[in-house]
Design a protein with these regions (language model features):
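Short glycine-rich, Thr/Ser-proximal phosphate-binding strand/loop in the N-terminal lobe
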Residues: 5-44, 287
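Short glycine-aspartate micro-motif
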Residues: 6-10, 62-64, 141-145, 262-263
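Glycine-rich phosphate-binding loops at beta-strand->alpha-helix junctions
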Residues: 15, 257-276
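N-terminal phosphate-binding loop and adjacent alpha-helix
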Residues: 26-62, 70-77, 181-184
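Glycine-rich phosphate-binding loop plus the immediately following alpha-helix
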Residues: 35, 39, 110-204
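Short beta-strand-loop/turn "lid" adjacent to the catalytic site in phosphate-handling enzymes
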Residues: 54-116, 157
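Adenine-nucleotide phosphate-binding core of ATP-dependent small-molecule kinases
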Residues: 204-247
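Glycine-rich phosphate-binding/hydrolytic loop that grips phosphoryl groups
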Residues: 275, 286-310
Length: 310
């Protein structure tokens, strides 16, 4: 039987994913728990409760955590590392709330718009993506990590130069849950590919017009019976993602249109962003995001002080 070497955890705001891992990163067991918002003030108790049986079988397993465990409301704040940052070097700056527990720091930069920007958790996903797509460690690369707060990361030879955060997912959720523009409360949020493509087309038709000037179309098109109530959310998603892509690509023009954009996300999000990038003439390659954080934690466990995951 393969021996357990360490425990890995991706501690998001709303969910905790834990894996018992072998030395090579293979997941032996997995489980879930409360996110950082719910675990606030009791991180140690939550972790110990979820991993008690794992530690009973092999005491003193080292733990590697990424995400919000290192935030200002986390277990112990892991200060942001400034960009440019060689991503492998995060393994040398782990925060330790207690012996045996290691929290990956986030990164900060001045983004292409000249404003401060931060990421926490995505740096570990980027490290994990290196294992699946080694070309990311060579030359200039543009990586898209879609989500609630989509990150666009600029890399050069494995060094994170800068990044840009676009709250595309959060804006979409706010519009769906708290606005009359997209849907009535009784209308479910479903994906309709045709309406999503229509939203992308609208984003491409007037690329210089801000998204704020076009959001009301989600309602007016429905009232004019040019858009179904069921398809309005997908149309809005297409408009938002299309505008995200259209606004971002010029900011990272130094990467060149010939270099594919790497998308690190779930299969469904990869497909949506790939369609948007194609609409604006960019090729893309997809990396499964579900396991990227754990692949990154596996790499960090090997790069950290000798023997920590032995």
């Amino acid at each position: 039987m393969t021996a357990a070497a360490y425990i890995a955890g991706d501690w998001g705001t709303s969910n905790l994913r834990l894996r018992l891992c072998a030395a090579d990163g293979t997941a032996l067991e997995s489980r879930q728990g409360p996110g950082a918002a719910e675990a606030r003030g009791k991180f140690a108790a939550v972790l110990d409760g979820l991993t008690a049986d794992w530690n009973a079988r092999r005491p003193a397993l080292p733990v590697f955590l990424c995400g919000m465990a290192g935030s200002t409301f986390g277990w112990l704040e892991a200060p942001y590392l400034p960009c440019p940052e060689e991503l492998d070097s995060v393994a040398g700056s782990l925060a330790r709330p207690r012996p045996g527990v290691h929290i990956v720091p986030g990164t900060r930069c001045t983004n292409p718009l000249g404003a401060p920007d931060v990421m926490r958790g995505e740096e570990t996903q980027l490290l994990g993506a290196f294992a699946v797509a080694p070309q990311l460690e060579r030359g200039r690369q543009l990586v898209c990590l879609p989500g609630t707060h989509t990150k666009w990361a600029s890399l050069h030879d494995g060094t994170l130069l800068e990044f840009l955060t676009v709250p595309t997912g959060e804006v979409f959720k706010l519009l769906c849950d708290h606005s009359v523009l997209v849907r009535d409360r009784d209308t479910p949020i479903e994906h309709h590919a045709r309406e999503f493509e229509r939203g992308l087309a609208e984003a491409a038709k007037h690329p210089g017009v801000p998204v704020l000037h076009r959001l009301f179309q989600s309602r007016s098109l429905r009232l004019d019976q040019q858009l179904s109530a069921q398809g309005a959310a997908s149309w809005t998603s297409g408009l938002l993602i299309g505008t995200d892509v259209a606004g971002t690509l010029p900011l990272f023009a130094a990467h060149g249109a010939e270099t594919p954009v790497t998308i690190v996300a779930t299969k469904s999000l990869c497909e949506l962003y790939a369609a948007a990038l194609a609409r604006f003439g960019r090729r893309s390659v997809a990396v499964a995001g579900d396991d990227a954080a754990f692949a990154g934690l596996a790499r960090i466990s090997l790069l950290s002080e000798p023997g920590v995951a032995a």
